[in-house]
C-alpha cells in the first residue's frame, strides 16, 4: 500500500490507509494507547484499544516520543478527538526508528500538581540539535511560509520576462564597499566569498539579459551579534534594464513584496496568526517614501531623537527602529522607503544625480532594513571615477570592463530571505535560518 499524507488521510473516512511520521505525543495506559502522529502536512490521532489489538501491545510498549513509525489502519470519525474529529484505528504499527530521550526541551512545559515546570532550552542549545528543534509546528510553518513567499516572488518575476541565473560565490574582489569579506585560498591566489551577486547581476545587464533574478547564499564577515545579523544568509536579488529612475526599482520591489505577502496570507495567514500572534498584512501601494534628512527631522519632533551631524548621512540602528513607529503614525503602513543617503555611505556603483546624491534607497519593514536598492551607474567613465574615489579601481578592473562595450541603464536590489522570514513571523534570525551561521556558530 502506498503512503498517504495525513492531510489526505483525514478525508478518507471509512477507508484503510497507510500513514508515516514522527510520534509527537504518546499516552500509553493499561487498557488504551493514544499516539499523535505528525508528518509535514498535519497530525492524526492513532487510537488503540489493547483488548481489541493484543498483537500491537509489545510494539506500543517500545515506542517513545519522536520515534518514527508506519501505521496502517481505518480512518474513523470521532467528535471527541480534537484533531479535526478524526482518528485512525490501527491494523498494524511498524517501527522505523526509535528515538532516545531528547537532549533539548523544545517547548516550555507547564507545572502540574505532580511535576515542576520545565523551561524551554535556550536558542543556542536548540541550534546544537537543530534537526530536533525543526520538528516543531512553529519552525516548520516558518519554512513553509518562506517557501511560499519565495515561490510567489519567483512566479511574479517569471511572468514579467525575468530570467533566473546562478552566479559564482567565489569571486576575485569584494563586491560591496563597507562590508567585510571572507578570504579563502584559491590555489596560488586569494579569492573571496561573495557578499552579493552584484557584479554578476550587472554583467547580465551588459550581456543583454535585460531582466534577471537569483536566489543564493550571501556571506558577510561581520562580527555582529544582533538578532538580525548572520555571516551567511539566503539572498533574493534582481536587476533589470531600461529604467529611467531608481523609482522604477522601488515600484518593482513594492509590487514584488505585495505579491509575496498576498500568497503567504492566502496560504498561511491564519496559522501564522495562531502560532506566532503575527498578522500578515498585505501592504497598499505605493509605499511611503521619505528623504533621510526629513526622517531625522521627523524623529526629532516625534521622539526627541537626535544624531550627530557626522551620522546624518546614514541610517542609525535606533533611527531604523523608530522609523516603524513614525511610518505607522503618519502613513498607517509597515513599509518605508528612505532615500537621499550620503555618497560616502553608498556603494561606488550607485548612480548619483547632478548634486552628487546617490540614486538609491533603503527599504524598512517593521523597523528593520530589508533592502538596499538603486539605479546603477552604467557609464564607464563616471563609474571608473567613482571607483577611484573609493580607492577600488584596481581591485574591480574586471568589473569595470563590463561597461566598456555598451550597457543599458539599469538598477536593482537584494533582499535577505531569512530576514523577511524573521519579520514575517516575529522571530530572531537564529530561528528564521535553517542553520544559523554567526561569528561563534559554524556547526551543525
Question: Where does each model-flagged region fall?
Answer:
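Class II aminoacyl-tRNA synthetase-like tRNA-binding/catalytic domains
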Residues: 2-243, 435
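Flexible helix-coil linker/hinge segments at domain or subdomain boundaries
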Residues: 259-273
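A translation/RNA-centric and nucleic-acid-associated enzymatic feature enriched
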Residues: 180-262, 285-444
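Polar, glycine-rich mid-to-C-terminal structural blocks
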Residues: 134-137, 266, 299
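Juxtamembrane/interface motifs at transmembrane-helix termini
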Residues: 108-109, 269-271, 419
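Short, highly charged C-terminal tails/helix-capping segments
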Residues: 271-285
Amino acid at each position: 500500500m502506498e503512503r498517504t499524507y495525513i492531510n489526505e488521510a483525514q478525508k478518507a473516512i471509512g477507508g484503510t490507509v497507510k500513514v508515516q511520521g514522527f510520534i509527537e505525543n504518546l499516552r500509553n495506559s493499561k487498557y488504551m494507547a493514544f499516539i499523535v502522529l505528525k508528518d509535514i502536512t498535519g497530525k492524526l490521532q492513532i487510537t488503540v484499544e489493547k483488548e481489541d489489538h493484543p498483537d500491537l501491545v509489545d510494539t506500543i510498549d517500545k515506542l517513545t516520543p519522536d520515534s518514527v513509525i508506519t501505521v496502517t489502519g481505518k480512518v474513523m470519525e470521532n467528535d471527541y478527538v480534537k484533531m479535526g474529529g478524526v482518528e485512525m484505528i490501527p491494523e498494524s504499527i511498524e517501527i522505523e526508528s526509535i528515538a532516545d530521550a531528547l537532549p533539548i526541551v523544545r517547548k516550555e512545559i507547564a507545572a502540574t500538581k505532580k511535576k515542576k515546570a520545565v523551561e524551554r532550552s535556550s536558542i543556542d542549545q536548540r541550534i546544537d540539535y537543530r534537526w530536533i528543534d525543526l520538528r516543531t509546528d512553529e519552525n516548520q510553518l516558518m519554512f513553509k511560509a518562506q517557501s511560499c513567499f519565495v515561490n510567489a516572488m519567483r512566479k511574479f518575476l517569471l511572468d514579467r520576462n525575468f530570467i533566473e541565473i546562478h552566479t559564482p560565490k567565489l569571486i576575485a574582489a569584494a563586491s560591496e564597499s563597507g562590508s567585510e569579506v571572507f578570504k579563502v585560498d584559491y590555489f596560488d591566489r586569494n579569492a573571496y566569498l561573495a557578499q552579493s551577486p552584484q557584479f554578476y547581476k550587472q554583467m547580465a545587464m551588459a550581456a543583454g539579459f535585460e531582466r534577471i533574478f537569483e536566489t543564493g547564499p550571501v556571506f558577510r564577515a561581520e562580527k555582529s551579534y544582533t538578532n538580525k545579523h548572520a555571516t551567511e544568509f539566503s539572498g533574493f536579488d534582481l536587476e533589470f534594464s531600461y529604467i529611467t529612475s531608481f523609482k522604477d526599482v522601488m515600484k518593482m520591489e513594492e509590487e514584488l513584496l505585495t505579491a509575496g505577502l498576498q500568497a503567504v496570507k492566502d496560504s498561511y495567514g491564519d496559522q501564522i496568526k495562531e502560532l506566532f500572534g503575527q498578522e500578515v498584512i498585505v501592504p497598499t501601494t505605493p509605499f511611503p517614501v521619505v528623504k533621510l534628512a526629513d526622517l531625522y527631522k521627523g524623529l526629532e519632533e516625534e521622539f526627541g531623537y537626535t544624531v550627530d551631524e557626522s551620522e546624518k548621512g546614514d541610517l542609525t540602528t535606533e533611527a531604523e527602529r523608530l522609523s516603524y513607529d513614525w511610518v505607522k503614525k503618519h502613513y498607517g503602513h509597515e513599509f518605508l522607503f528612505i532615500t537621499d543617503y550620503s555618497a560616502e555611505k553608498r556603494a561606488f556603483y550607485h548612480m548619483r544625480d547632478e548634486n552628487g546624491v546617490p540614486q538609491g534607497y533603503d527599504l524598512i519593514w517593521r523597523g528593520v532594513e530589508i533592502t538596499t536598492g538603486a539605479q546603477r551607474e552604467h557609464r564607464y567613465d563616471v563609474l571608473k571615477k567613482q571607483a577611484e574615489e573609493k580607492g577600488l579601481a584596481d581591485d574591480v578592473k574586471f568589473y569595470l570592463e563590463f561597461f566598456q562595450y555598451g550597457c543599458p541603464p539599469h538598477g536593482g536590489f537584494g533582499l535577505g530571505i531569512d530576514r523577511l522570514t524573521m519579520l514575517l513571523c516575529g522571530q530572531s534570525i537564529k530561528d528564521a535560518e535553517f542553520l544559523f551561521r554567526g561569528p561563534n556558530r559554524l556547526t551543525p
